[in-house]
């Protein structure tokens, strides 16, 4: 379990929702739902598991979650996310290509059916449901509550369900469309949670049955009421239009904005987009700018409808996105916007919590490093590394960490000027002297600690310059790597000794980040310089090509292979005369033939 996951686990909410596990490449490998996100997600990283789950956990490098309004919504969202992303660990469990829906047919005598195909046939579709068992259970309850036609018998012939009071097709005229429309609306309201009317009617019937001592019938009404209670959490309805919509919500705090977009495709919530950034104007203005950029240059598919929060001017959104803009005022659509907004708030709060936790840990690590070395808290740390390959293009680099964070504006690069050949000690001596003589001369802020990427020899050279040549009193430590080029041990003291440091400590992680960063910065600079030198040397001796024209070529083509692939016109277009461009192509052609 990495540090990011550890921090995120501490911030999980006690809410229903979906969690999304990702691997090292950011690929979604598993989607799950939970009544309580905190308990469920934490369970993956604590305790023992079967072999299959252990394999899944071994690949998890990060996770996300989406808070929902209920466990039912989490279940439906899980289904949609699995269908859309096909995570490899879900597919093994749920490889069915379609999920069941409950359908009210568009027939003269409408029927309730379970189907796995959604068609534009005028029917009403409810779902999707996780499996046929769940759909069957709900349909069974609907059959007992709403007397749709239950059989294929002709309308003039009664069926078994008629005697149970569950089918009215025999008594309702085919042309009485008002009755069937009303019944459809009752089902839609029921599955959307507006079931108070039905529950009250059932309670009245149960009471009357009890008063008449019809206890079996009263028990049936009781069971129906309990069944409704299990479905109290709102089900999402899919109509035959299967509309594509984007749902926007945003939240602002501490100068930051988080925008969440829910993508609804064919009536199903399948994905979300999360973006956090500092905002500088009024929040509504910056939100509008974000929406405009979101769809700019076909970055995202523009759906038929976009839902936005009530406080946003829809005419301004319409000006930048040519589609129907809706500000839902009530009902399910408004709840979708509220859900996007709620998730934006949760995401932004998580960012702040992670940042605060990281700051606390980093500050603690800095203080502990000071205690380990018996020096004041090293708020400003400057680290050095050399880079050369067989003595060519020798360079050095310095990175600066302030309060445990990189201060990139203070980074410095050094070309080694006085050393010939591969001599790390002499290179380190030159760089340390150049850096800290300038600190003294220009009155720059000195560091609280100098870190040398190297062993005893490099540290002693740096100390000699600081103490004996410049007369400064700055603590110097060394970070020595093992044979795998990984941070291995911290050297400090006079004489130098290894400072014990647990490898799973925040102090070790901080020093490792510093060493990795200075090495990255140095090696990148060395490659750039070596590339320029190679570029320049290959173009030496070409008639008419002086330093300024070489610079033009370097700026335009970046590297030698690009020049070799360029046409004559390409070279001329960057400001090189035709005759010189011809000389360049001829020279490079000869160079290739030699090689």
From Swiss-Prot:
Its main location: cytoplasm. Signal peptide: none annotated. GO terms for cellular component: cytoplasm; excinuclease repair complex. InterPro entries: GIY-YIG_endonuc, GIY-YIG_endonuc_sf, GIY-YIG_UvrC_Cho, RuvA_2-like, UVR_dom, UVR_dom_sf, UvrABC_protein_C, UvrC. Residues 14-91 form the GIY-YIG domain. Residues 196-231 form the UVR domain. It is found in: Cytoplasm. GO terms for biological process: nucleotide-excision repair; SOS response. The keyword Chloroplast does not apply. GO terms for molecular function: DNA binding; excinuclease ABC activity. Keywords: Cytoplasm, DNA damage, DNA excision, DNA repair, Excision nuclease, SOS response. It holds the Pfam family GIY-YIG. Belongs to the UvrC family. Interacts with UvrB in an incision complex. The UvrABC repair system catalyzes the recognition and processing of DNA lesions. UvrC both incises the 5' and 3' sides of the lesion. The N-terminal half is responsible for the 3' incision and the C-terminal half is responsible for the 5' incision. PANTHER family: UVRABC SYSTEM PROTEIN C (PTHR30562:SF1), UVRC/OXIDOREDUCTASE (PTHR30562). This is UvrABC system protein C.
């Amino acid at each position: 379990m990495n540090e990011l996951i550890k921090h995120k686990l501490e911030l999980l909410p006690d809410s229903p929702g979906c969690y999304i596990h990702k691997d090292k490449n950011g690929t979604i490998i598993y989607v799950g739902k939970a009544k309580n996100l905190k308990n469920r997600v934490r369970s993956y990283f604590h305790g023992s598991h079967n072999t299959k789950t252990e394999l899944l956990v071994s690949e998890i490098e990060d996770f996300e979650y989406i808070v929902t309004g209920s466990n039912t919504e989490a279940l439906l969202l899980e289904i949609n996310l699995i269908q859309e992303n096909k995570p490899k660990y879900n597919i093994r469990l749920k490889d069915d290509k379609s999920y069941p829906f409950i359908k009210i047919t568009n027939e003269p005598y409408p029927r309730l059916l379970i189907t796995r195909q959604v068609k534009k046939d005028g029917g009403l579709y409810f779902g999707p449901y996780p499996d046929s068992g769940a759909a069957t259970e709900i349909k069974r309850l609907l059959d007992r509550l709403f007397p749709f036609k239950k059989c294929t018998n002709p309308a003039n012939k009664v069926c078994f369900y008629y005697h149970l009071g569950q089918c009215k097709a025999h008594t309702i005229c085919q042309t009485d469309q008002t009755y069937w429309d009303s019944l459809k609306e009752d089902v839609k309201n029921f599955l959307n949670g507006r079931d108070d009317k039905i529950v009250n009617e059932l309670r009245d019937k149960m009471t009357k049955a009890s008063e008449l001592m019809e206890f079996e019938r009263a028990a049936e009404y009781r069971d129906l009421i309990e069944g409704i209670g299990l479905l109290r959490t709102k089900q999402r309805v899919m109509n035959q239009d299967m509309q594509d919509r984007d749902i926007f919500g945003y939240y602002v705090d501490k100068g930051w904005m988080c925008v969440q977009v829910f993508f609804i495709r064919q009536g199903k919530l399948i994905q979300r987009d999360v973006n956090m950034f500092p905002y500088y104007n009024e929040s509504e203005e910056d939100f509008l700018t974000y929406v405009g950029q979101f769809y700019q240059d076909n970055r995202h598919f523009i759906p038929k409808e976009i839902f936005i929060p009530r406080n946003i001017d829809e005419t301004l959104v319409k000006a930048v996105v040519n589609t129907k803009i809706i500000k839902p005022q009530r009902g399910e659509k408004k709840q979708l916007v509220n859900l996007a907004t709620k998730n934006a708030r949760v995401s932004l709060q998580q960012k702040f919590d992670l940042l605060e936790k990281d700051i606390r840990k980093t500050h603690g690590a800095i203080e502990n490093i000071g205690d380990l070395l018996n020096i004041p808290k090293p708020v400003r740390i400057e680290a050095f590394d050399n880079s050369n390959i067989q003595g060519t293009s020798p360079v050095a680099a310095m990175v600066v960490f302030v309060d445990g964070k990189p201060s990139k504006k203070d980074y410095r690069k050094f070309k080694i000027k006085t050393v010939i050949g591969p001599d790390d000690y002499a290179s380190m001596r030159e760089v340390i002297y150049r850096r800290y003589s300038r600190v003294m001369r220009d009155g720059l802020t000195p560091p609280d600690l100098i870190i040398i990427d190297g062993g005893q020899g490099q540290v002693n050279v740096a100390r000699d310059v600081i103490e004996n040549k410049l007369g400064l009193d700055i603590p110097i430590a060394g970070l020595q790597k093992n044979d795998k080029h990984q941070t291995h041990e911290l050297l400090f003291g006079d004489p130098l000794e290894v400072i014990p440091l647990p490898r799973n400590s925040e102090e070790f992680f901080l020093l490792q980040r510093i060493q990795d960063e200075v090495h990255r910065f140095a090696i990148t600079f060395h490659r750039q310089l070596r590339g320029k030198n190679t570029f320049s040397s290959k173009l030496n001796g070409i008639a008419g090509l002086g330093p300024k024209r070489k610079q033009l070529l370097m700026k335009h083509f970046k590297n030698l292979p690009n020049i070799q692939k360029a046409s004559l016109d390409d070279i001329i277009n960057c400001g090189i005369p035709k005759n010189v461009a011809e000389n360049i192509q001829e020279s490079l052609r000869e160079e290739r033939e030699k090689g």
